[in-house]
Amino acid sequence: MADESKDTTHFGYRTVAKDEKADMVADVFHSVAAKYDLMNDLMSFGIHRVWKRFTIDCSGVRRGQRVLDLAGGTGDLTAKFSRLVGETGEVVLADINSSMLKVGREKLRNKGIIGNVNYVQANAEALPFPDNYFDCITIAFGLRNVTEKENALASMFRVLKPGGRLLVLEFSKPQFEPLSKAYDAYSFHILPRIGEVVAKDAGSYRYLAESIRMHPDQETLKQMMADVGFENTTYHNLTGGIVALHRGFKF
């Protein structure tokens, strides 16, 4: 990762003031919210659904539990968790971006998913929930956009119950050189063109590609989770390491 002073951070490949990054990321997601689901399907050829299904399967969520779907966006994971926890459980879909939260709320309500789902606009670095509150937290394709990732992980640790688990699904580092080269070519040349045609926004998808390259790799993120208190932290490489699922427990 690039060197950063205490007052600056990265926005893709650019160095920006830390207090500016959140607004810049917000602009990206305000821009792409309406086409977010369609772009996910196009960008990943639908494979994101397999990655999310694997995350659900690894979550261990059961009936009656309380789940936080952080950076939950358009609610793919929330929809699945809602069925798993049942009427006696609760799922909180939290996102810092009001446009994404609006799309997610409308999508789930149109599917009849109501009653055990609540919506909260929240910053991952300072979660507005009590200590020891959730049985499980997921953050899918959201952590790389957070300015202070260590603060966010510590905040998630705080609101987890003892015995609770965090699952981080995020783009990561491909494990094979030929795959890495092909992935770079796709990310930097094809992906922005898809964004321009479908979402009328090549810049946001150029940022997406750059933000993935600046995100901590598998071992670094594993250590970051351990540093804030998570135990038994492991990760699974998916699609050759293009994506990784990290899981850690609070004891």
Curated annotation (Swiss-Prot):
Signal peptide: none annotated. Keywords: Menaquinone biosynthesis, Methyltransferase, S-adenosyl-L-methionine, Transferase, Ubiquinone biosynthesis. It catalyses: a 2-demethylmenaquinol + S-adenosyl-L-methionine = a menaquinol + S-adenosyl-L-homocysteine + H(+); a 2-methoxy-6-(all-trans-polyprenyl)benzene-1,4-diol + S-adenosyl-L-methionine = a 5-methoxy-2-methyl-3-(all-trans-polyprenyl)benzene-1,4-diol + S-adenosyl-L-homocysteine + H(+). Transmembrane segments: none annotated. InterPro entries: SAM-dependent_MTases_sf, UbiE/COQ5_MeTrFase, UbiE/COQ5_MeTrFase_CS. It is an enzyme of class 2 (transferase). Pathway: Quinol/quinone metabolism; menaquinone biosynthesis; menaquinol from 1,4-dihydroxy-2-naphthoate: step 2/2; Cofactor biosynthesis; ubiquinone biosynthesis. S-adenosyl-L-methionine binds at residues 74, 95, 123-124. Its EC number is 2.1.1.163, 2.1.1.201. GO terms for biological process: aerobic respiration; menaquinone biosynthetic process; methylation. GO terms for molecular function: 2-methoxy-6-polyprenyl-1,4-benzoquinol methyltransferase activity; demethylmenaquinone methyltransferase activity. The keyword 4Fe-4S does not apply. It comes from the Bacteria. The keyword Ribonucleoprotein does not apply. Methyltransferase required for the conversion of demethylmenaquinol (DMKH2) to menaquinol (MKH2) and the conversion of 2-polyprenyl-6-methoxy-1,4-benzoquinol (DDMQH2) to 2-polyprenyl-3-methyl-6-methoxy-1,4-benzoquinol (DMQH2). Belongs to the class I-like SAM-binding methyltransferase superfamily. MenG/UbiE family. NCBIfam families: MenG_MenH_UbiE, PRK00216.1-1, PRK00216.1-3, PRK00216.1-5. This is Ubiquinone/menaquinone biosynthesis C-methyltransferase UbiE. It comes from Erwinia tasmaniensis (strain DSM 17950 / CFBP 7177 / CIP 109463 / NCPPB 4357 / Et1/99). The gene is ubiE.
